[in-house]
């Protein structure tokens, strides 16, 4: 939502932005902000939709350590805007090579509008703001829908992409790492927080490989759902980790961030645990 106030000079658009207390994530506030004139090289996105999931919480929890708070800095100390995957349209441009009306997929804040200093790329735009310089290119990339080979039109398809696409890529890259290392000599992989989207992406890729047994570990509440997905050879609950045979080599990938559960895995398998990868923190309370 937005409001327009008229002055003698020009209209001032007030847009809503959502801010989180960086040290008390349950504390949030909505702020009305006026939009300044665009500087040369800048564009203004109107955010249309974004996905809010447990993974979004991870961005906030690890915001200081991994720099997620720096994606879209807040002017007021102690507050921040959480990034989320979604879709937005360019509604104003002060860049000679970027037209209004184009729609893009990428990282956006939980705000109605966001201004970026951009550079055109082969498939879209890249955020060139100095506060983003230290971030990996994948986090700064915005893909234009008419240049996106994976784009599917329609609200349902766009919702699914916002929910799943980014984390499937994370799972794919993690599985590719294990494959490049021949699964460290193991023929089994234990996937913690198996119902999470990154885990499902990983398991989908691992399940396609010959000779790799994929064991999902999840909560009792999520067991039936995780089993029904069909990409795990076996699904067990956290309390049943000790029932998995520990005599043969195994590797693990943890999306939960639960130190107590991961410690049980290391204790149970001992030297047979050939590699332990940690990604994310889905068990944050």
What are these regions (language model features)?
Residues 207-262:
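Adenosine-nucleotide cofactor-binding segment
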Residues 36-50, 64-115:
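Glycine-rich beta-strand-centered segment in the early N-terminal region that forms part
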Residues 58-81, 127-142:
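Aromatic- and Gly/Pro-rich amphipathic surface segment
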Residues 264-285:
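Glycine-rich phosphate-binding loop and adjacent beta-alpha segment
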Residues 107-187:
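NAD(P)H dinucleotide-binding glycine-rich loop of Rossmann-like/cofactor-binding domains
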Residues 199-200:
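N-terminal Rossmann-fold NAD(P) dinucleotide-binding loop
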Residues 189-193:
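Conserved N-terminal Rossmann-fold NAD(P)-binding element of oxidoreductases
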């Amino acid at each position: 939502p937005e409001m327009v106030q008229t002055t003698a000079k020009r209209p001032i658009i007030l847009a809503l932005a959502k801010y989180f207390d960086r040290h008390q994530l349950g504390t949030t506030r909505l702020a009305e902000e006026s939009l300044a004139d665009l500087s040369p090289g800048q564009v203004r996105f109107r955010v249309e939709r974004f996905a809010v999931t447990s993974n979004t919480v991870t961005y906030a929890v690890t915001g200081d350590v991994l720099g997620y708070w720096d994606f879209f800095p807040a002017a007021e100390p102690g507050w921040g805007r959480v990034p989320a995957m979604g879709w937005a349209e360019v509604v104003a441009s002060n860049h000679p090579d970027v037209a209004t009306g184009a729609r893009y997929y990428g990282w956006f804040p939980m705000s109605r509008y966001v201004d970026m200093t951009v550079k055109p790329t082969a498939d879209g735009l890249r955020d060139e703001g100095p506060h983003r310089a230290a971030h990996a290119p994948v986090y700064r990339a915005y893909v234009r829908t008419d240049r996106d080979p994976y784009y599917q039109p329609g609200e349902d398809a766009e919702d699914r992409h916002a929910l799943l696409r980014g984390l499937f890529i994370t799972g794919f890259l993690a599985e590719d790492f294990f494959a490049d290392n021949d699964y460290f000599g193991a023929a089994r992989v234990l996937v913690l927080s198996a119902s999470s989207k990154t885990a499902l992406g990983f398991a989908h890729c691992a399940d396609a490989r010959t000779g790799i047994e994929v064991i999902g570990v999840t909560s009792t509440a999520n067991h039936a759902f995780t089993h029904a997905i069909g990409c795990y050879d076996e699904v067990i609950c956290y309390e049943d980790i000790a029932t998995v045979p520990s005599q043969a080599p195994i590797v693990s990938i943890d999306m939960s961030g639960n130190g107590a559960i991961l410690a049980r895995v290391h204790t149970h398998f001992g030297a047979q645990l050939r590699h332990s990868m940690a990604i994310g923190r889905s068990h944050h309370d």
